[in-house]
């Protein structure tokens, strides 16, 4: 089982049923304050923390007096618009006194499905975490439709973990893990502490353990675990209703851990390496040597650009003699790459008319 305090980066998913009292519709302020203490402890140990938080619709429906019944799409989106403000304020109020800066990120499925938006989102996470902030992510329920929805925050948390390169994803739930059967219906159901491989049998064990305010049952959690572990991120499902749930998990609280067989970096490299290039960048000798030392590819080291590619597309990296030396995701489209090739990075704003990124291909986005 992984240690949260030993991880480089952790994503924590918080469900509506934990954050909002299902009877009153009020925020569980004491629970949130205790969670903030856990976050501060992890940050103090050098671990980056990203929160994926439900709760906007649950908070907003009470303010708009929408009752306990099913909401129409328009009602849900209105509740989300009202609730997001209250949700962001609640996190700010518990994190700021601990010296932590909170940041809100609202995503739709397109932000991970579209490669260019994926890279933008990944860069935003990196910039926030480098400055010590705690990103708080939710699905953009105000504008998302069925076609561009994650559908549940278990799936969203797994995708955020992949985008951000997290080591561990923790799903705080109203259950303490996966059982061989639904423990509410079967007294012989056995708890599964560790799952190394998600088999069809494991998926079949995932019954519906949803609660009144949550969308995701156990099945969505297992599917999320499949996404996360394939990208090198271990996942834990654990009881979140208790005070200080992250500290409890690190102290050995009951949970189901889904193990990852590779690191996030290895999984990402394999993903990039399997792509088909849509263009190529020819490098000078100095740039080729710099890449071999683990550096990013700067525009100054590019002598030729071929192909018709867009920002975020895979491109072949070539030595001066044309031999392939790797593949990477371009941070510029072909037209922009042609304009800035051979130029210093500080010349990019003048050439393109906007402040671009210094690297043409970042070292984290290439395989040699």
Swiss-Prot record:
Per the record, the pathway is: Amino-acid biosynthesis; L-proline biosynthesis; L-glutamate 5-semialdehyde from L-glutamate: step 1/2
Q: Where in the cell is it found?
A: Cytoplasm
Family matches, as Pfam families: AA_kinase, PUA
GO biological process terms held by the UniProt record: L-proline biosynthetic process
Q: Which residues form the PUA domain?
A: 278-355
Q: Which domain of life does the UniProt lineage start with? A: Bacteria
What CDD domains does its record include?
AAK_G5K_ProB, PUA_G5K
Give the reactions, separated by semicolons, that this protein catalyses.
L-glutamate + ATP = L-glutamyl 5-phosphate + ADP
Keyword check for Cell wall biogenesis/degradation, yes or no: no
Q: What are the binding positions for substrate in this chain?
A: 54, 141, 153
Q: Report residues binding ATP.
A: 13, 173-174
GO cellular component, as recorded: cytosol
A GO molecular function held by the record: glutamate 5-kinase activity
Chain's role = Catalyzes the transfer of a phosphate group to glutamate to form L-glutamate 5-phosphate.
Family of the protein in this entry: Belongs to the glutamate 5-kinase family.
- NCBIfam families referenced in this protein's UniProt entry, alphabetically: proB (TIGR01027)
Official protein name in the record: Glutamate 5-kinase
Organism this protein belongs to: Jannaschia sp. (strain CCS1)
